[in-house]
Amino acid sequence: MTSCQVAEDPIKKVAIFGGTHGNELTGVFLVKHWLENNTEIQRTGLEVKPFITNPRAVEKCTRYIDCDLNRVFDPENLGKRMSEDLPYEVRRAQEISRLFGPKDSEDSYDIIFDLHNTTSNMGCTLILEDSRNDFLIQMFHYIKTSLAPLPCYVYLIEHPSLKYATTRSIAKYPVGIEVGPQPQGVLRADILDQMRKMIKHALDFIHNFNEGKEFPPCAIEVYKIMEKVDYPRNESGEIAAIIHPKLQDQDWKPLHPGDPVFLTLDGKTIPLGGDCTVYPVFVNEAAYYEKKEAFAKTTKLTLNAKGIHSSLH
């Protein structure tokens, strides 16, 4: 073994979460299907558990009941004394942490795939929380290569103030899967097929790794979050301009200083400020209006991973 190779523990337990947001229907539909027939997600020697994370929100086809489940897996919320007064999603987070965590414990699941849809034109997106995770960089490289020529983007949310406490973060290896564009409360066959393929390739990678396949050093292109941009607002705090037509549906495309970003109702164009090119993501995402986020700025980086193999081989 050289210094470019790292031995990693084999993967034993994997969960696939759907319905973290109850109106993002691809994950809901796939997980419900796999709960009835799990043949396509089974791999030898691997426990793969499909799970509906927010059943009440799924039932009502809404993002959440009391608060966003994908933002409450922080120590404060997970440590609150259980009571009926707690928001439903905080109680649910504690249940999920007990079932699949707790984080950093011997009992926690090795990998959690959390399935999401976006109304933004983001295509196939993998969400990475740690830029130094050789195993996940290798997995994402495998998925991207397997999906080609279909593009698959990697969104790195590692940031001191913008990273959030995700549902999947209780696993050793948290993986967000985001596919769009798809309206809330709607199923599209093309989007479902893409998400299904992403999970297939991810499970194939895990199986190959567990069987002793060595993965040589690799590099992937990622888009790292820099800043969230709110809509222009008037004195009452109401939105005063909308996403400019030239920015709409242009996720992942370079956005230069001076390029149109917003358009007011009296026809005034508001351009991008600053002095550097950025790459916008979650452009005009429906769920982010309440979060005061018109889009997020990212910068493009290359991440390198050492070669990996299973410590059993």
UniProtKB/Swiss-Prot annotation:
Bound cofactor: record note: Binds 1 zinc ion per subunit.
HAMAP family on file: Aspartoacylase
Family the UniProt entry places it in: Belongs to the AspA/AstE family. Aspartoacylase subfamily.
A Pfam family recorded for this sequence: AstE_AspA_hybrid
Cofactor dependency: Zn(2+)
Location in the cell: Cytoplasm; Nucleus
Catalytic center residues: E178
Site (Transition state stabilizer) residue list: R63
EC number(s) stated in the UniProt entry for this protein: 3.5.1.15
Sites where the protein binds N-acetyl-L-aspartate: R63, N70, R71, Y164, R168, Y288
Gene name linked to the record: ASPA
GO cellular component: cytosol; nucleus
Transmembrane segments: none
Catalysis performed (reactions): an N-acyl-L-aspartate + H2O = a carboxylate + L-aspartate; N-acetyl-L-aspartate + H2O = L-aspartate + acetate
Primary location group: cytoplasm
Keywords: Cytoplasm, Hydrolase, Metal-binding, Nucleus, Zinc
The protein, known as: Aspartoacylase
